[in-house]
């Protein structure tokens, strides 16, 4: 079993991911979605957490061997990033969504040196907007952002477009395609549900029609 399928299995088992193609969720954006993900839940399950953190470390070593600092996005990327940095004996920092409105007004907490090679940790990629904002903030502070590594992606076309336009490499430990395949195999969804889930990936607006 691949790492992607192992993580997909764990996310379903611990109910970090819910699939309701016949009774969709409403995202904050207003989009009706057949999937809801809360990867913060993974922190409460040592087996799942260990699988994810080891997966992060292996992936970073394989794709970004020159990394010098790990950064987590606030707030979801902070705990994972801190664990990864500890496992890799690397410095850690975290990136706020916007600068503080008091004190030193920092957006990056921790010490990042000019030119330091950074990998940013995120838990979930939908359109990628927030983590790309974090990457831009890190670059403005002088970091050399090598890429983003995340637990899971919905594989939305908008995300691919956003990362391409930003020139930022994205790698995820698991993904939507892998998850719905595992969900079908393990009986979480029906054939009709799988069909709807596949339609959502291609068209987030008209998938129910």
UniProtKB/Swiss-Prot annotation:
Its cofactor is Mg(2+). 5-phospho-alpha-D-ribose 1-diphosphate binds at residues 96, 100, 102, 122-130. Orotate binds at residue 126. Pathway: Pyrimidine metabolism; UMP biosynthesis via de novo pathway; UMP from orotate: step 1/2. CDD domains: PRTases_typeI. Pfam families: Pribosyltran. The keyword Transport does not apply. One of its GO terms (biological process) is pyrimidine nucleobase biosynthetic process. Its EC number is 2.4.2.10. It catalyses: orotidine 5'-phosphate + diphosphate = orotate + 5-phospho-alpha-D-ribose 1-diphosphate. The keyword RNA-binding does not apply. Keywords: Glycosyltransferase, Magnesium, Pyrimidine biosynthesis, Transferase. GO terms for molecular function: magnesium ion binding; orotate phosphoribosyltransferase activity. PANTHER family: OROTATE PHOSPHORIBOSYLTRANSFERASE, URIDINE 5'-MONOPHOSPHATE SYNTHASE. Belongs to the purine/pyrimidine phosphoribosyltransferase family. PyrE subfamily. Catalyzes the transfer of a ribosyl phosphate group from 5-phosphoribose 1-diphosphate to orotate, leading to the formation of orotidine monophosphate (OMP). Homodimer. This is Orotate phosphoribosyltransferase. It comes from Streptococcus pyogenes serotype M3 (strain ATCC BAA-595 / MGAS315).
């Amino acid at each position: 079993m691949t790492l992607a399928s192992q993580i997909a299995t764990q996310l379903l088992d611990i109910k970090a991911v819910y699939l309701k193609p016949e009774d969709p969720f409403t995202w904050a954006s207003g989009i009706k979605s057949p999937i809801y993900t809360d990867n913060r839940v993974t922190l409460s399950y040592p087996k799942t957490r260990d699988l994810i953190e080891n997966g992060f470390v292996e992936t970073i070593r394989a794709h970004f061997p020159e990394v010098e600092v790990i950064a987590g996005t606030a707030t979801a990327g902070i705990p994972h990033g801190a664990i990864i940095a500890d496992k890799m004996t690397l410095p850690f920092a975290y990136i706020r969504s916007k600068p503080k409105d008091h004190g030193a007004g920092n957006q990056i907490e921790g010490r990042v040196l000019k030119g330091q090679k950074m990998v940013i940790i995120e838990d979930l990629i939908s359109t990628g907007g927030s983590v790309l904002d974090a990457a831009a903030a890190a670059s403005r502070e002088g970091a050399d952002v090598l890429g983003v590594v995340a637990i899971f992606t919905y594989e939305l076309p908008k995300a691919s477009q956003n990362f391409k336009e930003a020139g930022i490499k994205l790698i995820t430990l698991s993904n939507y395609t892998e998850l719905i395949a595992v969900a079908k195999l393990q009986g979480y969804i029906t054939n009709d549900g799988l069909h709807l889930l596949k339609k959502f990936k291609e068209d987030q607006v008209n998938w129910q029609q």
